[in-house]
From Swiss-Prot:
Gene3D superfamilies: 2.30.30.790
Similarity section: Belongs to the bacterial ribosomal protein bL19 family.
Keyword Ribosomal protein on entry: yes
HAMAP family reported for this sequence: Ribosomal_bL19
Disulfide bonds: none
The protein's role, per its UniProt record: This protein is located at the 30S-50S ribosomal subunit interface and may play a role in the structure and function of the aminoacyl-tRNA binding site.
Record-linked InterPro entries: Ribosomal_bL19, Ribosomal_bL19_CS, Ribosomal_bL19_sf, Translation_prot_SH3-like_sf
Protein name: Large ribosomal subunit protein bL19
Origin organism lineage: Bacteria, Pseudomonadati, Pseudomonadota, Alphaproteobacteria, Rickettsiales
Keyword Ribonucleoprotein attached: yes
Any Gene Ontology biological process: translation
Recorded GO MF terms: structural constituent of ribosome
Single GO cellular component term: cytosolic large ribosomal subunit
Keywords: Ribonucleoprotein, Ribosomal protein
Length: 138
């Protein structure tokens, strides 16, 4: 490994020390919680910074794995309009990433979903079977 790779690995380890990033792919539905900092002006004229969390849930249509600059693109339908938002995977602004359901697709980039709406934009859900406990045969 060269110096740049070592530097990236150290920074990724620091950024992921207090949060868990799940394994997800294109086609999975994720819920990304993002930290938002608002400025509010108080009555005496001072600025006050308030911090809140906002959830963004949608289908991952692209994932870009590039070390510390890795990102993923999430698409959702909001009030009848398609909205896409790109999140940096290791950004401190991203508070948490939760996988809501896993999808079955045959492509790495699902840009074709931009031109589909309604039932045509559905993605099959991956059914995860629960392991049955093995019983001893006597």
């Amino acid at each position: 490994m060269n110096i740049i790779d070592n530097f990236e690995q150290e920074n990724i380890a620091k950024l992921t020390a207090n949060k868990k990033i799940p394994d997800f792919e294109a086609g999975d539905t994720v819920k990304v919680t993002v930290k938002i900092i608002d400025k509010a002006i108080e009555k005496d004229g001072k600025e006050k910074l308030t911090e809140r969390f906002q959830a963004y849930e949608g289908v991952v249509i692209a994932k870009r794995n590039r070390g510390i600059t890795s990102s993923f693109l999430v698409r959702k339908i909001s009030h009848g309009e398609g909205v896409e938002r790109r999140f940096m995977t290791y950004s401190p602004i991203v508070h948490s990433i939760d996988v809501v359901k896993y999808g079955v697709v045959r492509r790495a980039k699902l840009y074709y979903l931009r031109h589909r709406n309604g039932k045509a934009a559905r993605i099959r859900e991956k059914l995860i079977s629960r392991a049955k406990p093995k019983t001893a045969i006597s």
